[in-house]
Amino acid sequence: MKIALDPYMFRSTPLAELPGLVAALGYSAIELSPREDFIPFYKHPRANTADIRAFKASLKVAEVEVVTLLPLFRWAGPGEEARQAAVRYWRRSIQIAAELGVPEMLSEFNGGPADPAECEALFWRSMAELLPDFEREGIRVVIEPHPNDFIEDGFAAVDMIRGINHPLVSFSYCAPHTFYMGGDIAGITEYAGDLLTHVHVADSFDFRGSSGLRYIVNIGAGGGVPNGITPPRIHQHLDIGQGEVDWDTFFGTLKRLQFDGVMTVCIFAWEERARESSVFNLQEIRKRMPGAA
């Protein structure tokens, strides 16, 4: 099992300096999430050949590897034009991953819950177009359900990935999304079985708690949700132990399943103490998963 850091809280750090920073924090692997100067959210990648070469050189010096590249594009819409653009962005991102020697790419179902059938149709179209690219480069694509995607439930997400029926497509369990996935950590991860190749580590509060009043969000007059708009999804990416994720069940189930994939620390909540947070969560994982690299 490899422990990686999503360095999103350090995104202002120049890319060439990032591997050294990650190594100084005690990590040897990076999950590279969107950066404006490399692969931005929902836009065409910015990285050119010189950028990639410089980044590879800095990775080598720091003895750090990129184990996962995480792009986010609208491959499930909304709309065909957005989907086609997303496929173009994906293809360039796959090229970048291949040039970096990254073995897997991680993303979300995307789309939205307001029209799940339409989003699913667009998603299948994108997968049909992109699978040959993943096959050509030998890169795994790992998918997780995210709050406000067209699929949010963990069991439904596993069923969808199983239905893709491709050896290069697998499932990621994102701990801070636990409560939108249905709350059953052991059930979902066991149901995924061999499809579970990646997990995200961060804590979150249970939005369902206290009769649904854990969070109170006022939208417009009277606090109602306008027609055609789904309620807001609220979650956090906190340090282990700061929320309500059942970590004994999470780590205990992964041990029982003999999980041997990528475990990424993806804390977003504490930019003012990003270094301390990154070190703390690495120590917590090593304490709970002895032998993890």
Residue ranges and their predicted role:
Residues L18-E36, G101:
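Catalytic domains of carbohydrate-active enzymes, especially glycoside hydrolases
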Residues M1-T13:
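Boundary/entry segment of secreted carbohydrate-active catalytic domains
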